[in-house]
Each structure stands twice: as structure tokens, then as C-alpha cells.
């Protein structure tokens, strides 16, 4: 894959853009090298960068369009050559460039006849259009085309069910993928001890290959930052292994629900031996002077845990039994 | 080179024949009607009949659910012959409406496109065959087949006695038949060539004496009468009418065939079976028995005839005229009796004819709903041939030889395009160039090669004739006149394949596709495919869903253009002119001084729920020629059929996700809308306009479900609806009986204080799986019901956009089909050496055993075409030009692509067509080079959304109390015998019990489960037998068999009877 000999200093790791081309406003190409790398390193970085470039880079897209006059996506508007659906498809294609967080609004307000292109979109200052000539619609009559747009910056793609919005706006399934294609190749030299990594990047113009490279590496570094912390953090992930598998609030939550459902006096009259507890738990509870359900409910989960021989599984079991028998504690009638 | 005939032409020609000849022929049979006193004559003028142009447009007929038909007017004359009044009254009268064929070759009946497919039948006539009987002795038979399919068999046995079989019953002596037909012994013996055989026969059977006896015996056989019927004149007449006239009518074709086979010269208009025929047939049978003369091949196309639309419609017209005649007779009689003055018009009305056609189009098996999945389906449907239907075969009894390909099919019936399953070989497809000849025979064109005329002369030959010519098979051409070896070509002669010198060839085929149907001729590299897979492909192309954005195929056969053109999916300029207005839904064209408004199809539903849509392709102000394409339809691009998409494919295993033909796809196909299609569903509700009312106030239901209704109670246009939403709110008044509710239901109502309603909600709800955008709402008045009970219906059309998803079926054009098993992000897909991730991963094991190598050629050539930006149109059998022509072409194109794009990996000489590719997850190259390519892949109509189904609760069958089956009825999955074994094998007794009782037909147990769910407690174990077993016991009882069980008490030995 190497076509020209490139002299690279063998000392420090360096990157360089060796080739860049712009086939059109919406197709940019760049080729980068990184060297010198030790044997095997190029592959490690290359595949990670390729995947990061393809999967991790954010893009800006129109996610939603709204127009007053349209009855539905498949309707036709007098004086417009395209159907609404085709206009939405054209809007989906429009490439934007922004440093936006979250969403923002934009609009199109054009009077016909004439062609509506991307440059007719009225955008907030921090969003700009990459290719002004992108076609949106062609108006054949002197009519007004007003479309409100919503712009979002995100990653990957979205396919939305339109049902969540009943306000007459139409979702455009956006594709936030500015990198069209990425490739890496490795060239080794010095008897295969050193390697040069080549990265090829094609983008859709909303960011240059160089920017894509920056962003991809930043995203990659962000993902690796946790490992840089010297001390392990107390993530719930690790806690769970030896402390409590139950989220701390559920027990109370459920009990509260139960208490609401039933009157307290009812609880008082129900003894725990009615609730088919396993003997061991039953004995544990008995030893701690818990006789009725009300007594049981007065203890929090931590209290229960403090009892002798009481294990976390038992709490779960109690919960299960309570829920099963308590809600439906009517006498079992034979049919 | 001749052009390919229009694909709908078969249908058009048929219909024209009916209008031009059929009508006149049947009208000429209409008799002069006289009343009993011979006072009045009523007759039609044959030469004056008119069809009036339909009052409505084709499109309106579909929209309003009407029939697209034209009125038939006939001049009629009423002659008064009695003395008081003696005059002639003439009038042009309306006798009914005839549905008219539309430009699709179909009819519109009640708003539904219907097509009448051609039937292929055994031609009436006589056929000699030899069969081995039970003792292994060959028996010679001559079968006389009548016009409607009835059979009469002559059979000669070992002792050279001739027997007759009428409809496979006991055999009779031929003398009985001949006597019954009115000949006496002397006449018989005088008119046969071998009277001694008949004489010997006579000695055996003494009892044939008189004609009466013969008729009696024959009648007994024919009508299966028990006992001894007494001879009477009426019996003789009955036999004449039922047997000799109805069952033995040969028809025009039959008479012609009989004359030809038996060397007779009976005039053409004598269409019944005559004694002379039988005598000649018997003579011929004797000769064949003794080795003189040839046997017939029943399956030869020569002995088949096509019953086309023309014949079927003509037959119905004849039937209608008989009814009309009876009506006229009745009315004349009534008029004279009640003394009203008849006029020609009030003697007849339009109901007999109109009703006959209505019934025909609705109920006749050969009148089918036009399948409109995609444009290809439409044209292919009209070119079908069926052996089934009235007068034909039945699918269950048809034998293997009938279904098989016959050498005479060459160029007439496609050898590969037929349906799979029970109808295999019985429903075929016409070859591209075939046409229907005069006597219902299928003709195929050939070029005549003769020394004298240099220019090739084309002639159409019927099935019997081309066998006697040397026909060059066309799979190898004598291109180089100089070389001796190439002067020898393969040829067909008398159903054999020979290799003969080029000079001896008399005919050659005109076109490489000549022997294929349209479906098969759209397969590139078909010659590299196994016929079974080509069959699947031609069927699957008809199931392809039009995609939201179509794409031309890179590798095609060149027939795509005409297929799209003839399908009617495109909007075509009817005359030249200038466009002065275009819009999304119409084009206005001015030319010849007037303006033509061409309405375009906008998101319309086809009967397979696919979406039909036309996109205008002309700009305002452009001048248009006649026949120019104005708008592309669904699944057409650039005037060519475009059913699928060219996608990058790799043939390799991938983590088992392409096991058993499953297909792995990239997310790109989802988010870039590569395989996104639109589906429009129609939901309809009948409204009984008396008591029922449509409203948006339905107290039974939650407000949330009613959110889309407007103030009239109908769903709003453009609203998004989900499963369970109300489309039309309707209330039906109801007499409420408190006791009609289930006890627990009543209890719940009391507890929760629910109101008791005086009306029932009978809303139209969106069924399971339905979701989408409401694009149209129509009120339709149904015209067919009586005036007293006017019913209306509301139709709601919902458009759904479906991306490709796991479970959808995709297929190539070589019978390579599969189900999507997983959708991977693009970075995880294997990628090529330039970083491009592939779109689909097929299983390489799907190729060798299926023998559809065409897909490999196609994908490689597709890749080359994609890189070079070229499109290839390849006629089949390019191997006739040189050895391995396909491979050479593909490799040379790949090589060029690799050179032009400077990508050496596209063509690697040590593994041409294959390339090293990388795993997207690890970046490692795969062990072996992998075939990559760009084939054309279709998305088929079998989609999970239409099939996925589960049942929690639902209805039960009335009788067995088992859950219903089928998704439409929200049915359950059958736990059959083998499933029970599986559960037994795992020892899961309780699950098995649950399957057989609570979840199925144990009524009491399943009610108890309901109670237990509400009130808690253990689910009781059912003790007695489930309902279907009880049903079985009762069925046995109805056969007087008692099945019961008793409990015997150990102490008292008392029997305790248990009711099963």
C-alpha cells in the first residue's frame, strides 16, 4: 500500500498528513502516518483508531422537521415537485458542521418559484452548512415553503418511532456519522522491528480528516482515562460483589407500597407463621421478637441483616413471600 | 432482429378475439323466439351490436370499488304476426354490461384488479396408447376426449375383442355402443375393415339383438341404474341428450383432430361423435394392435390446446344468452297472458349478462386477483398457464408425466418457471415469444435458413410441426465459416439432440431467451445455474418488494427495460407534446391542440400491501415524444425494472451467523434506507346505517386510545397510530342482559362500580402489528346490497415504513435466499483492503450443493461494474461464442477494474475473484481469501412484521375447545405429537400437563386458572379428561360405541361409573 518512501525521524512518535484530497465538498480524504512504532504497536493503534473513527465520532444532523401545511409525510404540496417524504429524505442528507451541544432550531423560509437548496436554511451562528448546493426541493409555483427544523449533535444513528411526538412534526431518522470510511495499513521496516502506521480517512465534509483523527483519538483517550487513576474507585459495580446485590431502596419502597395498600390493623393480626416462611428464617425472626407482619415491617433491611444467621438471600425470600401472600391473603377458596 | 412481443399481448389478443369474433359467434346462436301461438317473433340482428365506452375511468373504478365495464347494445326486432296487428318493431336494446380489459391486461371488478389466466387442456380428439395391465400384458386403448373433458375409451384385449369404457366404469362391448347409436349388425360389418373380428365377438355375446336392448344396457351402464329399467322412448331421448350430445360433443377442434387422426372427411360443422367415428376408431385400434400405425403422446403440446380469456368469456357469454333467451320467452308468454304490449327492451333486461360475468369473475378458479407485489409480478401473472380449473386436472391427481417438461415445450412453455409445491408443473409460464395460434395451439417463431433468400425469414410453427425440421439449438453458433469443426452444430430433430452440419440446419431459434419466461430471462448467467434454483429465482423475483429508493442492477440480461415498460408501472406519453405543468401528482401535456392530464399514482396500495408510487421525470417546458417515459413507477429506474439493490457481499462464515443460509448484514443497510420499503394496509369497517353510529364519544374506552379521532369519530388524516388505537369509533345499540356477563365479570363490575352501557362498542381497532401514518380515509357506499339495508363502509389506509430487520427474507437472483440473522455495526463487519466494510455476509456452503454458480459470476462482475461505473447486460448462453466466455468476461472486467482503480487486490491472479479481507473487530486478516462482489439482492415480501405472533389469551375453537390456529385469529402454537415427545423426553411432566389442559382444551381447569390469578392460591390439578377427549367419546357414542371408566370399590365391590 505504500507508494512513496517517506523519511521519518526514528526518534519520537510523530504523525504527519501525507496526502489529502477533496473530491467534493462532501468527500474529503486524508492519509496520515504515525511512526516510528515498535513491532505490533501499529496494529494495536490502527484497529482501535479505525473502530473509533467509524463508531465514536459525533456528527450534526437535522433530526426533525415541522411544517404547518402538511397533513402527513406522504402528502403532496401544490407547487412543489417533490413529495414531502422526498423533501425529508433530502434534509436527511444535508451535512452540517457545528460545535453544538444538545439541540437547536433552524428554519427554511423560501418563496417560489425556484430551487430550495441547503443555503436557504437559516441556522444559528454556531452551525454551518458544508455544501450550500445540496438540493432540498424545487418550487414551481409562487408559494411559500416554511419548514422548522431541529438540529442535534449525536453519535451513531437513530430510528425513532414518530408516535412520541404528536405536534405535527416529522422525525428524520438521522445518521450522525461524519466518517465515511477509514482504513489502516502497516508498513514495517528495519527487518520488521519498526512499523509505520498508515491511516486513511474519508469524511463527509462536516469535519476534515485531520479533525476526525483528533476527535477519534480524544474519544479513545477518554475511554481509557479511568485506567489512569491510580486508585480504584468505589464503583457500584465492584461493591456489589461482596456487599448487597439489592439496590438499597427497594425494600423500603416495596414495603411502603404494601403498607399503603393495607391497613395497619390488618398487619397486626397477621402472624409471620402464616406466611409460609422457611423454618430457619422463621426461627431467626422469632428469636428477634418479630411475630407479626407489623413487627417485620417496622424493621428496616439493615436491622434484619444485623440478626444472627440472617443472610441476604433470606431478605429476598421474605420479600418474595410477602408480596405473594400478602396481596392475596384471602382465604383460598376451592372452586 | 425482431422485437419482443408485448408481454401483455397474450391477454390483449385474447380479449380482442372475444370482442371481435366471440360476441358475434354467440349472438348468431341466439335463436328466433316464437311464442306458442306463433303470434310474436323476437330476434336479434347479428350484424349490429355495439359496446359503449365505459362511463367511468379506470382509476375511478378502482377508487370507488366499481366494475370497469361497458354496456352492450344489440339491435332487436319484434314481429307481430297475428291478423289484428301485423308489424315489425325494431329497437336497439341494452342486454348487459361486459367488463372491459384495462391496459394492464386485467379487469376491474368491484374495484379489484382481476386477471383471467390461460388454461391448457387436453385437446379433444382420439388418442391411442398402450398400457400394461395388471398381468403385465400390454393393452391398446383409444381414448376419445370430448370438448369439455369427458372420456370414452376403446380397448382391445388379448383375444382381439373391442370393449368400450364410459367414464372408467365396467366395460361394454363395442357392439352395444354402436347399436345404441343406431347401427344394426349388418351396417357395422359392412363399414369396417376387419369384420371377422367383430363377427367373432358376435359369437361370444349372443344377447345383443335389438337396438332397444343395446340402449337399455348402455343406459344401465351409463346412468348406473339399479334393477331393470324398461325401455321407453324417453329413456332413449335421455341417453341421446345426456350422453351423445353432452358428453360426446367434440367441438370444432375435436372434429378437426378426429378427421386428421382417423383420415375422415366429416364436415367441420358436425361437432358430435358419429357412429362412423367409432367404426374408424375401432379399425385404427385393430391396426395398432397388430403393429400398424403409431401411438400418440398425450403430453405432447400438439395434443393440448389453450383456452384463453377469449374462450372463457365467450363461454360465459353463451351461458348468459341462454338465460336471456329464457327470460325473453317468459316475458313474451307473460305479455300475451296479461295483455301488455311488449317492446324489445322490456322483454329483456341487463341482469342475466351482468350477473353472469360478475359470478364468473368472482368465482371462477381461473379468474384470479392480479398479483401486484411489484411490476414484474403484474406482467408475469397474465402469462401464466394452468392445467387446473374446470375441465382440467386437479392438483392431487395429476400424474408425473403431465407435470414434466416435454420436448415440445421448447419455445412455448418455459421449462423452469413453475410454482413449487403441489402445483409443480401444472402452473406454467409462457415463453417470451410464444403466441396463441388459431386452434388454441401454442406457436413459437423460428428463422428459416434457406439458400435462396439471404434475409432470414421468420415463421411461427405450431407444436407438431417444428419437430420435423432440423432446428439449430442455439447453444453454439457456426461463427467461423472457414474451420471445418465449427461447421458442426448441435440441433434438435424429432425430439432428439443431434450434431449435424450447418448446411443441414433448416430452422434456428430467433432469440437466446426464446425458451424462457420473463421471470427466468431476468436471471443473468442462468446457464450456470441449476434449474431448480433458477425456478426459485424466477418465483422470488416476483416476491421482491419495491424499495423506497430503487437502483438499477449492474449485471442484468437486457430485458429489464421491456419488463418495466410493459408492466404499466411507468407513466408513458400517449402522444407527443410539450409539458406545461408538472407536479407531484399530475403532469399536464399539451399537444395536437388539446391538453392531456396525466394523473400520477401517489402512494397507492397494491393488493399485496406494497406501495405504488410514481415520480415525475420530466421538467416543465420540455418537448415530449410519443412513448417517452414521463414518470418512473415503483421498482423502476431509468425505465428499467429495479427490484433490489447492489450491495457489497462476502462469501464467508462469520461466527455461525450465516449457518443454514442465514445472512449477516451491516447496519448501513438500515440507516441509509437501502432496504427500506413502504407498506400500505387497508382497514375496513362496515357501518349498518340504521342503528349504528360513528362517533368519537366512546365511554367504554380510554381517552388515550381515542386521541386520533376527529369530531365525527373517524381517524384524522396524517395521524400516527399504533396497535390498539381506534380508527373508527362505532357504537352498536344493544339490549343489555345482566346475566350475559360471566360471573367474575359481573362481580368485578359491581366492585369497581363500572357502568352498564346500553350500547356495545364495535370500533375499528388497529390490529396487532399495525402501526403507521394514516394517509387516506374513504367512505364507500356499497352498491350491491338492497335499497332497504344501505351499508356503508369506511376504509382507512395506513402507510408503514419498514427498515430491514432480523427475520426478513432476502434473496439474490439465483435462488440464493436467506433470512437476516444479525445486524452488525459497520465497524464490526469484515472489511476490504481499502477499508470498505461489506454489507452482507453469505454462507459459502450455500453455493456448491445448490449448484447456482451464476451468483458468483454475477457478484464478481458486479464488483467490477461498480468500480468501473459500468452496467452489463448479458444474454444467456454466451458460451456459444467461445469456451468459458462468462468466466473470461468476468475476469477481464475484474482485471480492468483493478488496473483502473489501482487496487491490485481486486484481481489477484492466484485467486481471481477472491481477495484477502479483514475482521472488523480485530483487524486481523482472515485465513483464506474470500469471494467478494456486488450482486443484486432483493428484499422479499416475507417479512417478520407480518409473521411474528404470540398468544397470551384468545379464542377457542367451538367444537374441540382448543385454541384456534393462525396469526389472524390470534391463535396458539400447536403442540403436536413430536412436541409432546420432546417434553416427555425432558421429563417435564407439569409443563406437558399445562400444555394439554390449562393452555388448551380443559375448560374447567382453564376457568379455575383465571379465578386463581384473580384471587390467589394454588392452581388446582385437573382431574378429568379435556374437552377434545370428551368430544371423541361422544363421537364414538354416535357410532354406538361406549367408552367409559368405572371405579370399583375394594370393600363393597360396587361399581362407580365415571362420566368421561
From Swiss-Prot, chain A:
Pfam families: RNA_pol_A_bac (PF01000), RNA_pol_A_CTD (PF03118), RNA_pol_L (PF01193)
Cellular compartment(s): Plastid, Chloroplast
EC number(s) recorded for this UniProt protein: 2.7.7.6
GO cellular component: chloroplast; DNA-directed RNA polymerase complex; mitochondrion
Location of region: Alpha N-terminal domain (alpha-NTD): 1-231
SMART domains referenced in this protein's UniProt entry, alphabetically: RPOLD
GO term, biological process aspect, one: DNA-templated transcription
Keywords: Chloroplast, DNA-directed RNA polymerase, Nucleotidyltransferase, Plastid, Transcription, Transferase
Molecular function terms, GO-annotated: DNA binding; DNA-directed RNA polymerase activity; protein dimerization activity
Chain positions covered by the region annotation Alpha C-terminal domain (alpha-CTD): 263-335
Reactions the enzyme catalyzes: RNA(n) + a ribonucleoside 5'-triphosphate = RNA(n+1) + diphosphate
Domain notes from UniProt: The N-terminal domain is essential for RNAP assembly and basal transcription, whereas the C-terminal domain is involved in interaction with transcriptional regulators and with upstream promoter elements.
Protein family: Belongs to the RNA polymerase alpha chain family.
Function: DNA-dependent RNA polymerase catalyzes the transcription of DNA into RNA using the four ribonucleoside triphosphates as substrates.
Cited HAMAP family: RNApol_bact_RpoA
Subunit structure: In plastids the minimal PEP RNA polymerase catalytic core is composed of four subunits: alpha, beta, beta', and beta''. When a (nuclear-encoded) sigma factor is associated with the core the holoenzyme is formed, which can initiate transcription.
Listed name of the protein: DNA-directed RNA polymerase subunit alpha
Swiss-Prot record, chain B:
Cross-referenced InterPro entries: DNA-dir_RNA_pol_bsu_ext_1_sf, DNA-dir_RNA_pol_su2, DNA-dir_RNAP_su2_dom, DNA-dir_RNAP_su2_hyb_sf, RNA_pol_bsu_bac, RNA_pol_bsu_CS, RNA_pol_bsu_protrusion, RNA_pol_Rpb2_2
Domain of life: Eukaryota
TM segment ranges: none
Record's subcellular location: Plastid, Chloroplast
Record's keyword terms, sorted: Chloroplast, DNA-directed RNA polymerase, Nucleotidyltransferase, Plastid, Transcription, Transferase
SUPFAM superfamilies with a match to the protein in the record: beta and beta-prime subunits of DNA dependent RNA-polymerase
Pfam (any one): RNA_pol_Rpb2_3
Keyword Glycosyltransferase tagged: no
UniProt keyword Signal, yes or no: no
EC number: 2.7.7.6
Molecular function as annotated in GO: DNA binding; DNA-directed RNA polymerase activity; ribonucleoside binding
GO biological process, one term: DNA-templated transcription
Subunit structure: In plastids the minimal PEP RNA polymerase catalytic core is composed of four subunits: alpha, beta, beta', and beta''. When a (nuclear-encoded) sigma factor is associated with the core the holoenzyme is formed, which can initiate transcription.
Assigned protein family: Belongs to the RNA polymerase beta chain family.
Reported function: DNA-dependent RNA polymerase catalyzes the transcription of DNA into RNA using the four ribonucleoside triphosphates as substrates.
Protein name: DNA-directed RNA polymerase subunit beta
Species of origin: Helianthus annuus
Lineage: Eukaryota, Viridiplantae, Streptophyta, Embryophyta, Tracheophyta
